[in-house]
Amino acid sequence: MGFRGAWNKRNRLIEDLDTFLKLYKKAQKAYKKVRKVEFSNNDELIENAKKRYQEIWDEFRAFVNKKAWVDPKLWATIRKMNQTGDRKVVKTYSRDSQVISDFVNHTIAVHNGKTFVPIYITPEMVGHKLGEFAPTRTFRSHPEKSAKVVKKK
């Protein structure tokens, strides 16, 4: 029952970041409560905590499923940078976050499993996932045929 980001099918933008963050924090608190209560012997407490968490989680999923998924911390950072006019490189592990219009003209360093790959966001990238621009595998040319390799008929 861990927290996972929802995948969006409609590619819409979340306009209300404050509501999103409130629901996100509410879901996290409810999940922590479930984890805390699981060690008690009171089955009624456990069931109530799980039921409450499920209600909050369903509300969060209903809100997120209609919108594009963006990591809340990444979005909050970019939002602050837009307000102050900063243009620093932002590091993120969130490859599944979608590029939204707020990210345009920013450089986001996306982790590819080994290093952070800096990506300058352009308007053409809006709607794509950040992970699409940070390849996880390096392509080295195909091996050349050597004289030792002989085809058998």
UniProtKB/Swiss-Prot annotation:
Gene Ontology cellular component list: cytoplasm; small ribosomal subunit
Residue ranges of the region described as Small ribosomal subunit protein uS19: 64-153
Signal peptide: none
GO MF assignments: rRNA binding; structural constituent of ribosome
Keyword rRNA-binding recorded: yes
Alphabetized UniProt keyword annotations: Ribonucleoprotein, Ribosomal protein, RNA-binding, rRNA-binding
Pfam families on file: Ribosomal_S19
GO BP term, example: translation
Domain of life: Bacteria
InterPro entries linked: Ribosomal_uS19 (IPR002222), Ribosomal_uS19_bac-type (IPR005732), Ribosomal_uS19_CS (IPR020934), Ribosomal_uS19_SF (IPR023575)
Start and end residues of each stretch annotated as Unknown: 1-63
The UniProt record lists the keyword rRNA processing: no
Role of this protein: Protein S19 forms a complex with S13 that binds strongly to the 16S ribosomal RNA.
Assigned protein family: Belongs to the universal ribosomal protein uS19 family.
NCBIfam families: rpsS_bact
This protein's name: Small ribosomal subunit protein uS19
Organism, scientific name: Hydrogenobaculum sp. (strain Y04AAS1)
